[in-house]
Amino acid sequence: MKEDEPAGPKVEDLIAQAKMVLDFNWTGEYTRPGPRLYPHQWSWDSALIALGYARYAPDRAMRELSHLFDAQWKNGLLPQIVFNPDFAAYFPDASFWHADESPDAPTHLRTSGIVQPPVHATAVLALLRNAAEAPGVRSFCEKAFSRLVSWHDYLYRERDPGGENLVYIRHPWESGMDNSPMWDAILESMFLYPSDIPSYKRADTHFVSSEDRPESAAYDRFAYLVKLFAERNYDEARIREDCPFLVQDVLFNSLLCRAERDLAELARTLGEEPSAFEARARKTAEAINDKLWDGERGTYLGFDLVSGAHIKVLAAPNFVALYGEVPDRKRARAMLARLSSPSFSLTEGTGVPVTSYDRLGFGFSSVRYWRGPVWVNIDWFLMHGLRRYGYEDEADRLREAIVRLCREEGFYEYFDPTTGMGHGSDLFSWTAALLLDVVLEG
Protein backbone atom coordinates (compact mmCIF):
# COMPACT_ATOMS: atom_id res chain seq x y z
CA MET A 1 0.00 0.00 0.00
CA LYS A 2 1.12 3.57 -0.59
CA GLU A 3 2.26 5.73 2.33
CA ASP A 4 1.03 8.96 0.76
CA GLU A 5 -2.70 8.23 0.81
CA PRO A 6 -4.98 11.31 1.00
CA ALA A 7 -6.46 12.36 4.30
CA GLY A 8 -9.58 10.56 5.48
CA PRO A 9 -10.42 7.16 6.92
CA LYS A 10 -7.46 4.87 7.42
CA VAL A 11 -6.79 2.38 4.66
CA GLU A 12 -7.89 -0.44 6.97
CA ASP A 13 -11.23 1.28 7.50
CA LEU A 14 -11.64 1.87 3.76
CA ILE A 15 -10.99 -1.81 3.10
CA ALA A 16 -13.58 -2.76 5.71
CA GLN A 17 -16.12 -0.38 4.15
CA ALA A 18 -15.54 -1.82 0.66
CA LYS A 19 -16.02 -5.35 1.96
CA MET A 20 -19.23 -4.25 3.66
CA VAL A 21 -20.57 -2.98 0.31
CA LEU A 22 -19.89 -6.34 -1.30
CA ASP A 23 -21.37 -8.21 1.66
CA PHE A 24 -24.50 -6.05 1.47
CA ASN A 25 -24.95 -6.76 -2.24
CA TRP A 26 -24.16 -10.48 -2.01
CA THR A 27 -27.27 -12.59 -2.67
CA GLY A 28 -25.79 -15.98 -1.89
CA GLU A 29 -25.25 -16.73 -5.59
CA TYR A 30 -23.96 -13.49 -7.09
CA THR A 31 -23.32 -9.85 -6.19
CA ARG A 32 -25.82 -7.20 -7.21
CA PRO A 33 -24.06 -4.29 -8.93
CA GLY A 34 -26.18 -1.93 -6.80
CA PRO A 35 -28.82 -2.53 -4.15
CA ARG A 36 -31.76 -0.80 -5.86
CA LEU A 37 -30.98 0.12 -9.45
CA TYR A 38 -29.33 -3.19 -10.40
CA PRO A 39 -30.87 -6.20 -8.62
CA HIS A 40 -29.86 -8.91 -11.12
CA GLN A 41 -26.48 -10.32 -12.15
CA TRP A 42 -24.60 -8.36 -14.81
CA SER A 43 -21.86 -10.05 -16.79
CA TRP A 44 -18.90 -7.69 -16.77
CA ASP A 45 -19.86 -6.38 -13.36
CA SER A 46 -19.45 -9.90 -11.99
CA ALA A 47 -16.06 -10.30 -13.65
CA LEU A 48 -14.81 -6.99 -12.22
CA ILE A 49 -16.30 -7.82 -8.83
CA ALA A 50 -14.48 -11.16 -8.91
CA LEU A 51 -11.19 -9.25 -9.28
CA GLY A 52 -11.81 -7.80 -5.84
CA TYR A 53 -12.94 -11.09 -4.31
CA ALA A 54 -9.82 -12.77 -5.70
CA ARG A 55 -7.79 -10.68 -3.25
CA TYR A 56 -9.51 -11.90 -0.09
CA ALA A 57 -12.51 -14.19 -0.73
CA PRO A 58 -11.69 -16.70 -3.50
CA ASP A 59 -14.65 -18.91 -2.63
CA ARG A 60 -17.02 -16.05 -3.34
CA ALA A 61 -15.21 -15.20 -6.59
CA MET A 62 -15.74 -18.78 -7.73
CA ARG A 63 -19.42 -18.74 -6.81
CA GLU A 64 -19.89 -15.39 -8.55
CA LEU A 65 -18.44 -16.58 -11.83
CA SER A 66 -19.98 -20.06 -11.60
CA HIS A 67 -23.46 -18.56 -11.43
CA LEU A 68 -22.76 -16.54 -14.56
CA PHE A 69 -21.19 -19.46 -16.45
CA ASP A 70 -24.21 -21.58 -15.54
CA ALA A 71 -26.31 -19.21 -17.68
CA GLN A 72 -24.08 -19.48 -20.75
CA TRP A 73 -25.93 -20.25 -23.98
CA LYS A 74 -25.25 -23.40 -25.99
CA ASN A 75 -23.56 -21.34 -28.72
CA GLY A 76 -21.15 -19.81 -26.19
CA LEU A 77 -22.90 -16.46 -25.70
CA LEU A 78 -22.32 -15.22 -22.15
CA PRO A 79 -25.39 -13.13 -21.37
CA GLN A 80 -25.33 -9.53 -20.19
CA ILE A 81 -27.93 -10.22 -17.48
CA VAL A 82 -28.92 -13.32 -15.52
CA PHE A 83 -32.31 -12.51 -14.03
CA ASN A 84 -33.26 -13.13 -10.43
CA PRO A 85 -36.98 -14.04 -10.35
CA ASP A 86 -37.29 -12.49 -6.89
CA PHE A 87 -36.77 -9.01 -8.38
CA ALA A 88 -39.51 -8.35 -10.92
CA ALA A 89 -39.61 -4.53 -10.88
CA TYR A 90 -36.91 -3.93 -13.47
CA PHE A 91 -36.90 -2.89 -17.12
CA PRO A 92 -36.22 -4.68 -19.31
CA ASP A 93 -37.21 -7.83 -17.45
CA ALA A 94 -36.84 -11.38 -18.72
CA SER A 95 -40.24 -11.37 -20.44
CA PHE A 96 -39.26 -8.32 -22.51
CA TRP A 97 -36.22 -10.08 -23.95
CA HIS A 98 -37.96 -13.28 -25.13
CA ALA A 99 -34.53 -14.90 -25.04
CA ASP A 100 -36.19 -18.28 -24.79
CA GLU A 101 -37.08 -17.85 -28.49
CA SER A 102 -33.51 -18.93 -29.18
CA PRO A 103 -32.79 -22.67 -29.16
CA ASP A 104 -29.41 -21.80 -27.63
CA ALA A 105 -30.74 -20.08 -24.51
CA PRO A 106 -30.71 -21.94 -21.19
CA THR A 107 -34.00 -23.32 -19.93
CA HIS A 108 -33.22 -23.30 -16.20
CA LEU A 109 -32.32 -19.60 -15.97
CA ARG A 110 -33.76 -16.47 -17.62
CA THR A 111 -31.27 -14.19 -19.33
CA SER A 112 -31.01 -11.25 -21.68
CA GLY A 113 -30.01 -11.88 -25.29
CA ILE A 114 -26.93 -9.70 -25.59
CA VAL A 115 -23.39 -9.70 -24.16
CA GLN A 116 -21.02 -7.35 -22.32
CA PRO A 117 -17.26 -6.75 -22.62
CA PRO A 118 -15.14 -9.91 -22.26
CA VAL A 119 -13.18 -9.43 -19.03
CA HIS A 120 -13.97 -12.89 -17.67
CA ALA A 121 -10.71 -14.63 -18.61
CA THR A 122 -8.90 -11.76 -16.93
CA ALA A 123 -10.90 -12.37 -13.74
CA VAL A 124 -10.26 -16.14 -13.76
CA LEU A 125 -6.52 -15.60 -14.30
CA ALA A 126 -6.45 -13.11 -11.42
CA LEU A 127 -8.10 -15.69 -9.19
CA LEU A 128 -5.52 -18.31 -10.13
CA ARG A 129 -2.65 -15.88 -9.57
CA ASN A 130 -3.88 -14.52 -6.24
CA ALA A 131 -5.36 -17.64 -4.67
CA ALA A 132 -3.79 -20.64 -6.41
CA GLU A 133 -3.41 -22.54 -3.13
CA ALA A 134 -6.95 -21.90 -1.90
CA PRO A 135 -9.20 -24.97 -1.82
CA GLY A 136 -11.00 -25.61 -5.10
CA VAL A 137 -9.40 -22.77 -7.07
CA ARG A 138 -7.41 -24.83 -9.55
CA SER A 139 -10.33 -27.20 -10.14
CA PHE A 140 -12.63 -24.23 -10.71
CA CYS A 141 -10.20 -22.66 -13.19
CA GLU A 142 -9.94 -25.92 -15.12
CA LYS A 143 -13.73 -26.02 -15.49
CA ALA A 144 -13.95 -22.30 -16.26
CA PHE A 145 -11.34 -22.66 -18.99
CA SER A 146 -13.71 -24.53 -21.33
CA ARG A 147 -16.44 -21.95 -20.65
CA LEU A 148 -14.07 -19.14 -21.58
CA VAL A 149 -12.95 -20.89 -24.76
CA SER A 150 -16.59 -21.32 -25.80
CA TRP A 151 -17.30 -17.65 -25.00
CA HIS A 152 -14.40 -16.32 -27.04
CA ASP A 153 -15.12 -18.75 -29.88
CA TYR A 154 -18.69 -17.42 -30.04
CA LEU A 155 -17.41 -13.86 -30.42
CA TYR A 156 -14.98 -14.65 -33.22
CA ARG A 157 -17.41 -17.00 -34.98
CA GLU A 158 -20.66 -15.03 -34.72
CA ARG A 159 -19.52 -11.43 -34.38
CA ASP A 160 -16.75 -11.36 -36.99
CA PRO A 161 -18.40 -12.69 -40.17
CA GLY A 162 -15.83 -10.97 -42.37
CA GLY A 163 -12.89 -12.62 -40.64
CA GLU A 164 -11.28 -9.29 -39.76
CA ASN A 165 -10.32 -10.39 -36.22
CA LEU A 166 -12.50 -7.53 -34.95
CA VAL A 167 -15.81 -8.42 -33.35
CA TYR A 168 -18.87 -6.20 -33.45
CA ILE A 169 -21.43 -5.26 -30.83
CA ARG A 170 -25.09 -4.96 -31.82
CA HIS A 171 -26.52 -2.86 -28.99
CA PRO A 172 -25.17 0.09 -26.94
CA TRP A 173 -25.75 -2.01 -23.82
CA GLU A 174 -23.19 -4.51 -25.13
CA SER A 175 -20.49 -1.86 -24.89
CA GLY A 176 -21.03 -1.41 -21.16
CA MET A 177 -21.13 2.32 -21.96
CA ASP A 178 -24.83 2.59 -22.69
CA ASN A 179 -25.20 6.35 -22.97
CA SER A 180 -21.87 7.31 -24.53
CA PRO A 181 -21.89 10.11 -27.13
CA MET A 182 -20.16 7.58 -29.38
CA TRP A 183 -23.58 6.11 -30.15
CA ASP A 184 -25.51 9.35 -30.71
CA ALA A 185 -25.23 9.59 -34.49
CA ILE A 186 -26.20 5.95 -34.99
CA LEU A 187 -29.20 6.18 -32.68
CA GLU A 188 -30.34 9.47 -34.21
CA SER A 189 -30.19 7.92 -37.69
CA MET A 190 -32.68 5.24 -36.64
CA PHE A 191 -36.04 6.59 -37.82
CA LEU A 192 -38.81 4.81 -35.94
CA TYR A 193 -42.57 4.86 -36.29
CA PRO A 194 -44.48 4.76 -32.99
CA SER A 195 -45.50 1.20 -33.83
CA ASP A 196 -41.82 0.20 -34.00
CA ILE A 197 -41.28 1.00 -30.34
CA PRO A 198 -42.40 -1.72 -27.93
CA SER A 199 -44.31 -0.67 -24.84
CA TYR A 200 -42.11 -0.32 -21.78
CA LYS A 201 -41.83 1.48 -18.47
CA ARG A 202 -38.45 2.59 -17.22
CA ALA A 203 -37.44 1.75 -13.66
CA ASP A 204 -34.06 3.50 -13.47
CA THR A 205 -35.39 7.03 -13.00
CA HIS A 206 -37.35 5.93 -9.92
CA PHE A 207 -34.06 5.34 -8.10
CA VAL A 208 -31.71 8.04 -9.41
CA SER A 209 -32.12 11.50 -10.90
CA SER A 210 -33.30 11.60 -14.51
CA GLU A 211 -30.52 14.16 -15.07
CA ASP A 212 -28.02 11.34 -14.58
CA ARG A 213 -29.64 8.82 -16.92
CA PRO A 214 -30.10 8.31 -20.70
CA GLU A 215 -32.86 10.33 -22.36
CA SER A 216 -36.15 8.77 -23.48
CA ALA A 217 -35.34 8.93 -27.21
CA ALA A 218 -32.28 6.76 -26.63
CA TYR A 219 -34.29 4.31 -24.55
CA ASP A 220 -36.85 3.99 -27.35
CA ARG A 221 -34.06 2.83 -29.63
CA PHE A 222 -32.59 0.53 -27.01
CA ALA A 223 -36.01 -1.13 -26.71
CA TYR A 224 -36.46 -1.30 -30.49
CA LEU A 225 -33.18 -3.19 -30.88
CA VAL A 226 -34.25 -5.75 -28.28
CA LYS A 227 -37.50 -6.23 -30.21
CA LEU A 228 -35.55 -6.72 -33.44
CA PHE A 229 -33.36 -9.42 -31.87
CA ALA A 230 -36.32 -11.30 -30.41
CA GLU A 231 -38.21 -11.21 -33.72
CA ARG A 232 -35.21 -12.91 -35.31
CA ASN A 233 -34.99 -15.53 -32.55
CA TYR A 234 -31.51 -14.28 -31.67
CA ASP A 235 -30.11 -15.76 -34.86
CA GLU A 236 -26.92 -13.76 -35.43
CA ALA A 237 -26.95 -14.15 -39.22
CA ARG A 238 -30.52 -12.85 -39.44
CA ILE A 239 -29.85 -10.03 -36.98
CA ARG A 240 -26.89 -8.60 -38.86
CA GLU A 241 -28.84 -8.53 -42.14
CA ASP A 242 -30.74 -5.40 -41.06
CA CYS A 243 -29.58 -4.42 -37.57
CA PRO A 244 -28.92 -0.64 -37.62
CA PHE A 245 -26.35 -0.88 -34.82
CA LEU A 246 -23.23 -2.91 -35.68
CA VAL A 247 -20.05 -1.41 -34.24
CA GLN A 248 -16.46 -2.61 -33.99
CA ASP A 249 -15.84 -0.98 -30.62
CA VAL A 250 -12.36 -0.14 -29.35
CA LEU A 251 -12.94 -0.98 -25.69
CA PHE A 252 -14.68 -4.28 -26.44
CA ASN A 253 -11.99 -5.45 -28.86
CA SER A 254 -9.14 -4.22 -26.66
CA LEU A 255 -10.53 -6.12 -23.69
CA LEU A 256 -10.95 -9.17 -25.92
CA CYS A 257 -7.31 -8.84 -26.97
CA ARG A 258 -6.27 -8.72 -23.30
CA ALA A 259 -8.60 -11.61 -22.47
CA GLU A 260 -7.14 -13.77 -25.24
CA ARG A 261 -3.66 -13.20 -23.81
CA ASP A 262 -4.96 -14.04 -20.35
CA LEU A 263 -6.64 -17.16 -21.73
CA ALA A 264 -3.29 -18.17 -23.21
CA GLU A 265 -1.65 -17.70 -19.81
CA LEU A 266 -4.39 -19.79 -18.20
CA ALA A 267 -3.78 -22.48 -20.80
CA ARG A 268 -0.05 -22.58 -20.03
CA THR A 269 -0.69 -22.77 -16.29
CA LEU A 270 -3.31 -25.51 -16.66
CA GLY A 271 -1.28 -27.60 -19.11
CA GLU A 272 -3.33 -26.67 -22.18
CA GLU A 273 -2.08 -25.45 -25.56
CA PRO A 274 -1.92 -21.60 -25.64
CA SER A 275 -0.88 -20.95 -29.24
CA ALA A 276 -4.37 -20.45 -30.72
CA PHE A 277 -5.23 -17.79 -28.14
CA GLU A 278 -1.89 -16.05 -28.57
CA ALA A 279 -2.45 -15.95 -32.32
CA ARG A 280 -5.94 -14.48 -31.99
CA ALA A 281 -4.69 -11.83 -29.56
CA ARG A 282 -1.93 -10.86 -31.96
CA LYS A 283 -4.28 -10.71 -34.96
CA THR A 284 -6.86 -8.67 -33.06
CA ALA A 285 -4.20 -6.18 -31.94
CA GLU A 286 -3.02 -5.89 -35.55
CA ALA A 287 -6.59 -5.33 -36.75
CA ILE A 288 -7.23 -2.62 -34.15
CA ASN A 289 -4.03 -0.89 -35.23
CA ASP A 290 -4.72 -1.24 -38.95
CA LYS A 291 -8.39 -0.24 -38.97
CA LEU A 292 -9.19 1.81 -35.87
CA TRP A 293 -6.18 4.11 -35.33
CA ASP A 294 -6.75 7.84 -35.92
CA GLY A 295 -3.48 9.74 -36.05
CA GLU A 296 -5.13 13.17 -36.06
CA ARG A 297 -6.86 12.52 -32.74
CA GLY A 298 -4.08 10.46 -31.23
CA THR A 299 -6.21 7.49 -30.28
CA TYR A 300 -8.36 4.69 -31.67
CA LEU A 301 -11.92 5.14 -32.92
CA GLY A 302 -14.75 2.66 -33.24
CA PHE A 303 -16.06 1.71 -36.68
CA ASP A 304 -19.73 1.75 -37.69
CA LEU A 305 -20.22 -1.23 -40.00
CA VAL A 306 -23.60 0.05 -41.21
CA SER A 307 -22.38 3.44 -42.44
CA GLY A 308 -18.88 2.23 -43.21
CA ALA A 309 -17.28 5.09 -41.27
CA HIS A 310 -15.28 5.70 -38.12
CA ILE A 311 -17.08 7.10 -35.09
CA LYS A 312 -15.21 10.38 -34.66
CA VAL A 313 -15.94 10.92 -30.98
CA LEU A 314 -13.23 11.25 -28.34
CA ALA A 315 -14.07 9.15 -25.30
CA ALA A 316 -11.89 7.69 -22.55
CA PRO A 317 -12.87 4.06 -23.26
CA ASN A 318 -11.05 4.29 -26.59
CA PHE A 319 -7.80 4.61 -24.64
CA VAL A 320 -8.37 1.20 -23.04
CA ALA A 321 -6.35 -0.09 -26.00
CA LEU A 322 -3.40 0.66 -23.68
CA TYR A 323 -4.69 -1.99 -21.30
CA GLY A 324 -4.92 -4.42 -24.20
CA GLU A 325 -1.28 -3.61 -25.09
CA VAL A 326 -2.42 -2.76 -28.59
CA PRO A 327 -0.36 0.36 -29.54
CA ASP A 328 3.36 0.53 -30.14
CA ARG A 329 5.45 2.97 -28.09
CA LYS A 330 4.98 5.85 -30.51
CA ARG A 331 1.21 5.54 -30.51
CA ALA A 332 1.15 5.06 -26.74
CA ARG A 333 2.97 8.41 -26.38
CA ALA A 334 0.38 10.08 -28.60
CA MET A 335 -2.41 8.58 -26.52
CA LEU A 336 -0.80 9.79 -23.30
CA ALA A 337 -0.52 13.29 -24.76
CA ARG A 338 -4.23 13.30 -25.57
CA LEU A 339 -5.17 11.93 -22.14
CA SER A 340 -2.99 14.60 -20.53
CA SER A 341 -4.65 17.42 -22.46
CA PRO A 342 -7.61 19.48 -21.20
CA SER A 343 -9.89 16.99 -22.98
CA PHE A 344 -9.37 14.38 -20.25
CA SER A 345 -7.22 16.14 -17.62
CA LEU A 346 -4.98 13.25 -16.68
CA THR A 347 -2.16 15.65 -15.84
CA GLU A 348 -3.42 19.07 -16.94
CA GLY A 349 -6.39 21.13 -15.82
CA THR A 350 -8.42 20.71 -12.68
CA GLY A 351 -10.68 18.04 -11.33
CA VAL A 352 -10.56 14.29 -11.07
CA PRO A 353 -9.13 12.15 -13.90
CA VAL A 354 -10.28 10.90 -16.27
CA THR A 355 -13.49 12.13 -17.77
CA SER A 356 -15.37 9.44 -19.69
CA TYR A 357 -15.93 11.86 -22.58
CA ASP A 358 -13.99 14.79 -24.00
CA ARG A 359 -14.47 17.85 -21.74
CA LEU A 360 -14.37 20.00 -24.87
CA GLY A 361 -16.83 17.84 -26.78
CA PHE A 362 -20.41 18.71 -27.70
CA GLY A 363 -22.85 17.73 -24.98
CA PHE A 364 -20.28 17.08 -22.26
CA SER A 365 -21.98 16.61 -18.90
CA SER A 366 -20.27 16.11 -15.58
CA VAL A 367 -23.23 14.14 -14.21
CA ARG A 368 -24.98 12.31 -17.06
CA TYR A 369 -24.30 8.60 -17.54
CA TRP A 370 -21.14 8.08 -19.67
CA ARG A 371 -21.18 11.67 -20.97
CA GLY A 372 -18.40 12.97 -18.77
CA PRO A 373 -18.37 11.44 -15.28
CA VAL A 374 -15.38 9.53 -13.96
CA TRP A 375 -15.80 5.75 -13.78
CA VAL A 376 -13.56 3.70 -11.51
CA ASN A 377 -13.41 0.79 -13.96
CA ILE A 378 -12.12 3.01 -16.77
CA ASP A 379 -9.52 4.55 -14.44
CA TRP A 380 -8.52 1.02 -13.39
CA PHE A 381 -8.06 -0.13 -17.00
CA LEU A 382 -6.07 2.99 -17.87
CA MET A 383 -3.97 2.74 -14.70
CA HIS A 384 -2.85 -0.77 -15.63
CA GLY A 385 -2.44 0.15 -19.28
CA LEU A 386 -0.23 3.15 -18.56
CA ARG A 387 1.85 1.10 -16.15
CA ARG A 388 2.46 -1.51 -18.85
CA TYR A 389 4.07 1.21 -20.98
CA GLY A 390 6.19 2.55 -18.13
CA TYR A 391 4.12 5.65 -17.36
CA GLU A 392 4.31 5.17 -13.60
CA ASP A 393 3.54 8.74 -12.52
CA GLU A 394 0.38 8.91 -14.59
CA ALA A 395 -0.69 5.45 -13.42
CA ASP A 396 -0.14 6.51 -9.81
CA ARG A 397 -2.32 9.58 -10.40
CA LEU A 398 -5.18 7.31 -11.45
CA ARG A 399 -4.59 5.01 -8.50
CA GLU A 400 -4.75 7.98 -6.17
CA ALA A 401 -7.94 9.19 -7.86
CA ILE A 402 -9.63 5.82 -7.28
CA VAL A 403 -8.67 5.78 -3.61
CA ARG A 404 -9.56 9.43 -3.04
CA LEU A 405 -12.99 9.18 -4.65
CA CYS A 406 -13.94 6.13 -2.59
CA ARG A 407 -12.53 7.60 0.60
CA GLU A 408 -14.06 11.06 0.30
CA GLU A 409 -17.30 10.37 -1.57
CA GLY A 410 -18.12 6.71 -1.05
CA PHE A 411 -18.66 3.78 -3.38
CA TYR A 412 -20.75 5.35 -6.13
CA GLU A 413 -21.32 4.18 -9.67
CA TYR A 414 -19.63 7.24 -11.17
CA PHE A 415 -18.37 10.66 -10.07
CA ASP A 416 -18.52 14.30 -11.12
CA PRO A 417 -15.02 15.07 -12.48
CA THR A 418 -15.19 18.67 -11.24
CA THR A 419 -16.53 18.26 -7.71
CA GLY A 420 -15.89 14.57 -7.11
CA MET A 421 -19.51 14.10 -6.01
CA GLY A 422 -20.88 10.59 -6.46
CA HIS A 423 -23.77 9.88 -8.85
CA GLY A 424 -25.82 6.94 -10.07
CA SER A 425 -26.15 3.97 -7.76
CA ASP A 426 -24.62 4.20 -4.33
CA LEU A 427 -23.01 1.16 -2.70
CA PHE A 428 -21.84 0.18 -6.17
CA SER A 429 -20.11 -3.18 -6.20
CA TRP A 430 -17.43 -2.87 -8.86
CA THR A 431 -16.29 0.43 -7.37
CA ALA A 432 -15.77 -1.35 -4.04
CA ALA A 433 -14.18 -4.40 -5.66
CA LEU A 434 -11.69 -2.46 -7.78
CA LEU A 435 -10.78 -0.30 -4.79
CA LEU A 436 -9.96 -3.52 -2.94
CA ASP A 437 -7.91 -4.77 -5.87
CA VAL A 438 -5.93 -1.52 -5.87
CA VAL A 439 -5.21 -1.26 -2.14
CA LEU A 440 -4.64 -4.98 -1.53
CA GLU A 441 -2.25 -5.31 -4.46
CA GLY A 442 1.16 -6.72 -3.38
Curated annotation (Swiss-Prot):
Binding site for substrate: 38, 42-45, 90, 116, 176, 213, 369-370
Protein family per UniProt: Belongs to the glycosyl hydrolase 63 family.
GO MF terms held by the record: Glc3Man9GlcNAc2 oligosaccharide glucosidase activity
Control of this protein's activity: Activity is not stimulated by divalent cations and not affected in the presence of EDTA.
Enzyme class, broadest EC rank: hydrolase
UniProt record, GO biological process: oligosaccharide metabolic process; protein N-linked glycosylation
Alphabetized UniProt keyword annotations: Glycosidase, Hydrolase, Plasmid
Catalysed reaction equations from the record: (2R)-2-O-(alpha-D-mannosyl)-glycerate + H2O = D-mannose + (R)-glycerate; (2R)-2-O-(alpha-D-glucopyranosyl)-glycerate + H2O = (R)-glycerate + D-glucose
Function: Hydrolase that catalyzes the hydrolysis of mannosylglycerate (MG), a solute produced in response to osmotic stress in thermophiles, into mannose and glycerate. Can also hydrolyze glucosylglycerate (GG) to glucose and glycerate, with similar catalytic efficiency. Is highly specific for MG and GG, and cannot use mannosylglyceramide (MGA), glucosylglycerol, mannosylglucosylglycerate (MGG), glucosylglucosylglycerate (GGG) or trehalose as substrates.
PANTHER family: MANNOSYL-OLIGOSACCHARIDE GLUCOSIDASE
Entry-linked Gene3D superfamilies: 1.50.10.10
Record note on quaternary structure: Homodimer in solution.
EC code(s) of this entry: 3.2.1.170
Annotated protein name in UniProt: Mannosylglycerate hydrolase
InterPro entries reported for this sequence: 6-hairpin_glycosidase_sf, 6hp_glycosidase-like_sf, Glycoside_hydrolase_63, MGH1-like_GH
Pfam families: MGH1-like_GH (PF22422)
Dependence of activity on temperature: Optimum temperature is 55 degrees Celsius. Retains about 28% and 14% of maximal activity at 30 and 80 degrees Celsius, respectively.
Native source species: Rubrobacter radiotolerans (Arthrobacter radiotolerans)
Coiled-coil zones: none
Active site: 178, 413
